[in-house]
């Protein structure tokens, strides 16, 4: 099963690279333009999707102007089952999105593999209403196999400016075995992390080729990195308060 899982993950990644290449390039261009014009990159996901927002935040080798939006009741540590139930509530997103500093010069990623629950959909709609370019990473196969739980009847991919398909299967579990009664082993996290890091890698090069120094974190475990990082954090701390611990 170890080799089988590696094979299946590689198949998903190859599908993304083959079929989503132009969307990945477009996302990278939009990200690079936003940062050069003073914007930031904001991300939101519920449950396990929020892991992707943390993967790229305050990351060695990653972009500095990254702002994840955390609403702890929708994360797992305050009650995993409860978080799943809350994600299904229409208009709940307004409780934490109304006062978020989202601007027209920003890019906003919404991450949801099923794409059917109200909270991610409302988050995407709010980001768009505030003028941010909104990119969704989702599974079209999964989304199209299930009815929307949003009051509009729409799925997440239907409300985005740009959609990137992560090619997760329905239910996200990619493996099966004759001795196991249900499918198992998800792919959305490893593929989603790869998608985001690939987009940001391309965006970094686009900025550099345009004569703009990309704001990149060095690992804090390298001597001299703190001075480098603190100078860039100073530039973005007001827009990304959680970089320095402000709520």
UniProtKB/Swiss-Prot annotation:
Segments crossing the lipid bilayer: none
Molecular function GO terms recorded: carbohydrate derivative binding
SUPFAM superfamilies xrefs: SIS domain
Annotated InterPro entries: RpiR-like_SIS, SIS_dom, SIS_dom_sf, SIS_GmhA/DiaA_subfam, UPF0309
One GO term (biological process): carbohydrate derivative metabolic process
PROSITE patterns in the record: SIS
All residue ranges annotated as the SIS domain in the record: 31-214
UniProt superkingdom: Bacteria
Family: Belongs to the UPF0309 family.
Protein name in UniProt: UPF0309 protein GWCH70_1414
Organism annotation: Geobacillus sp. (strain WCH70)
């Amino acid at each position: 099963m170890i080799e089988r899982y590696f094979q299946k993950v590689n198949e998903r990644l190859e599908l993304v690279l083959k079929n989503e290449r132009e969307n990945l390039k477009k996302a990278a261009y939009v990200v690079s333009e936003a940062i050069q014009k003073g914007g930031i990159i904001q991300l939101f996901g519920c449950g396990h999707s929020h892991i992707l927002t943390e993967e790229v935040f305050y990351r060695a080798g990653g972009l500095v102007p990254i702002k994840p939006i955390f609403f702890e009741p929708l994360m797992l540590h305050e009650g995993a089952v409860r978080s799943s139930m809350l994600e299904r509530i229409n208009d709940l997103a307004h409780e934490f999105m109304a006062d978020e500093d989202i601007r027209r010069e920003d890019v906003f990623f919404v991450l949801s593999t099923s794409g059917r629950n109200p909270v991610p959909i409302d988050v995407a709609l709010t980001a768009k209403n505030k003028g941010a370019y909104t990119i969704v990473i989702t599974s079209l196969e999964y989304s199209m196999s299930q009815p929307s739980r949003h009051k509009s009847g729409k799925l997440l991919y239907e409300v985005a400016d740009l959609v990137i398909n992560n090619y997760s299967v329905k239910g996200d579990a990619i493996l099966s075995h004759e001795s196991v009664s249900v499918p198992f082993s998800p792919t959305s996290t490893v593929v989603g992390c790869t998608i985001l890091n690939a987009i940001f890698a391309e965006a970094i090069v686009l900025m550099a080729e345009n004569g703009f120094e990309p704001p990149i974190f060095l690992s804090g475990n390298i001597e001299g990195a703190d001075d480098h990082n603190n100078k860039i954090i100073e530039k973005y701390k007001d827009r990304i308060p959680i970089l320095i611990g402000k709520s």
